[in-house]
Amino acid sequence: MPSKLFVGNLPDNVDSNKLKQVFQPFCKVTECDIVKNYAFVHIEEDDVDPIITRLTGYTIDGKVVNIKKSTSKLRPTPGMPNRCFRCQSDEHRTPQCPQDPTNNQKTENGVQTLKFDLTSGAGVKRSAGDPIIDSAKRIAYGAQSVVEPEIPQPMDPDLQALYQEYQLSRQRYVYYRDRLLKEMEAKQHGSTAGFALSSSSTVPVPVASAPPGATQLSAAPVSYQPNAPPVIASINAPYAVASNLRAPYALQSAPYASAASAPYGSVTPAGAPSNVMTTQQYLQQIQHQQATGSPAPVPAPPRLY
């Protein structure tokens, strides 16, 4: 049967290998447990008295060690006896003690059932249908949840505008969540006024200010509509119906009019503005109208050059 020896008054620099070398010439050492200035040496010999006699007065680093048989304060003899610690009986051990109330609680199949008190003496637990809390308040405030922690502000200047929109979204979420819970509570109590504001009133929602030079972002929904041409109202002018009405000086026989079949665009002569009639051409047109008898229109101010 293995035994254990107590070794006291050890120096501070003693390790398990050095202590094991002291006992190996006299016995077979299995383990050494050093605790500050004392240790426990486990050996395989049953008779430890000769070993204690030989090592009495042994000196390690100038200190005389104290060696004796290790015993427990509760058990004078080493080893675990076959005695019940509950009823002090030698016929059985503690797990099989009949005085243990948990050993008598068995089911029909002979399986032992263990019961644990999880309340720790705090009292009787409330049931799910406990009417202490009002049902309306339970509905209104039962849906509250912990808002996730806020993300720290990044140091990158390109992310500042997006981070401000993130903070604004968090503020809006908390505001509308509290408003919804208050409305639900008001509806449960039968209140007609409520806590919500009417649609015509304005609610000051916090708006994040963009830093200088950054792009302003918006979290509000924007409705997009296809681009449609503007509607022009009809005009009751005498010349609105005529589609081939031209100015009196817009002649197709002008020397500067380009042909329709030209493969390239017309080139305006250098020094002369485009779509401008000369004075000679304008006088020829007036004479032609007087000869044919057509009424002469009010001429536009000529551009002379």
Curated annotation (Swiss-Prot):
Pro residues bias locations: 296-305
Domain of life of the organism encoding this protein: Eukaryota
GO molecular function, one term: zinc ion binding
Keyword terms of this UniProt record: Metal-binding, RNA-binding, Zinc, Zinc-finger
Gene Ontology CC: nuclear speck
Recorded phenotype for the gene knockout or disruption: Hermaphrodites are sterile and produce no oocytes due to the failure of the germ line to transition from spermatogenesis to oogenesis during oocyte development.
SMART domains: RRM (SM00360)
Residue ranges occupied by any RRM domain in the UniProt entry: 3-72
Zinc finger (CCHC-type): 84-97
Expressing tissues: Expressed throughout the germline.
GO BP of this protein: oocyte fate commitment; positive regulation of oocyte development; spermatogenesis
Summary of the function given for this chain in its UniProt record: RNA-binding protein that is required for the germ line to transition from spermatogenesis to oogenesis and allow for normal oocyte development.
Listed name of the protein: RNA-binding protein rnp-1
Organism: Caenorhabditis elegans
Gene label: rnp-1
